[in-house]
Amino acid sequence: FLLGAAVAHPLIPERFSARMRMQLLSSQPSLHARLRVTASRRHAAPEGGACGDTGAIEKAPDGRVILLLADGMGTGEGARRLSRRALALAREFLECGLNEFTAYRAINRLSDGGREAFSTLDVCEIDPVTGTARFHKCGSEPTWLLRGRTARRIEGASLPVGVVAEATPSVASAHLRPGDAIIMATDGLVNALGGEPAAEAWFQTLSTLSPAAFCTASLKEARSRNRAARPDDMSILCARIQKRSPLLDRAPALPDPIPDDPPAAQPDTAAGP
């Protein structure tokens, strides 16, 4: 009955009925999921001001885990508004199941292009059933996939969102294994660590840490290496891939993905079936 109402009721707008159908069909966790994702993020702003970066760890109705990190142009409140808007639009469209190219065209058209107001956007969608990760990059820093002693750098050449209406993201994919770690960071943190090669070397030394410990250690190291330079907003998100265990199936609720003030410290968040 509920599914029929969601499909056919004339008073329900189409965009909401589509979401209702997805939620009704996907409300139960998949019994076939073989992976579990735990993730954490950290943000830091110069001298305690507003951080222009925004991050989120989401679980879509169909079971996908979506990691998002955005860096608004500039610093302070203006940058934060830009990054929050870009991230909110990406979250909304991707959770509804739109493919990435359609979603990012819509984001670009809804953004303030032409007024030099743009934001980078770094997204990773993880399917815990198939073990596939898809990376969407719009003007963002590389994403690192750590596996044992090796590191794969995932890069893209696309423009930030809001620059060109028809721009699409750079897209890559990877097959995940238990023990893998996914690292996403903004340019403030990567530059503070000494650039991409130095950041990669640092990340590899932390490959066995929990996501929360990984993020905390990376921010601390970035601050210590960057004492003489003008500080920038710094953000990092770390996700750890684990083999699913029935004993861990009751995951805590995910936090609000866009808090009024990005937290300096956020505990590990369990996501996935």
For the regions a language model picked out, list residue spans one by one.
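Short, solvent-exposed secondary-structure boundary motifs
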Residues: R42-G49, S111-R115, T132, G162-E166
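Short hydrophobic-aromatic micro-motifs
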Residues: V65-L69, F135-H136, I182-A185
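Short, surface-exposed beta-strand-loop junctions and turns on beta-sheet-rich folds
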Residues: M73-G74, S140-T143, T150-R152, P160, ...
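Acidic loop->beta-strand submotif enriched in PP2C/PPM serine/threonine phosphatases
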Residues: G49-D62, F118-L121, R153-G195, R227-P231
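N-terminal entry segment of metal-dependent catalytic domains or homologous docking segments
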Residues: P10-M73, G78, R84-A88, A167-S173
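Intrinsically disordered or compositionally simple regulatory linkers and C-terminal tails
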Residues: L24-R34, T38, I241-G272
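Catalytic core of PPM/PP2C metal-dependent serine/threonine phosphatase domains
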Residues: F1-P29, R80-R149, E155, P169, ...
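Active-site-proximal, acidic helix/loop segment immediately C-terminal to a metal-coordinating Asp/Glu
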Residues: G74-C96, A165, L176, D180-A229, ...
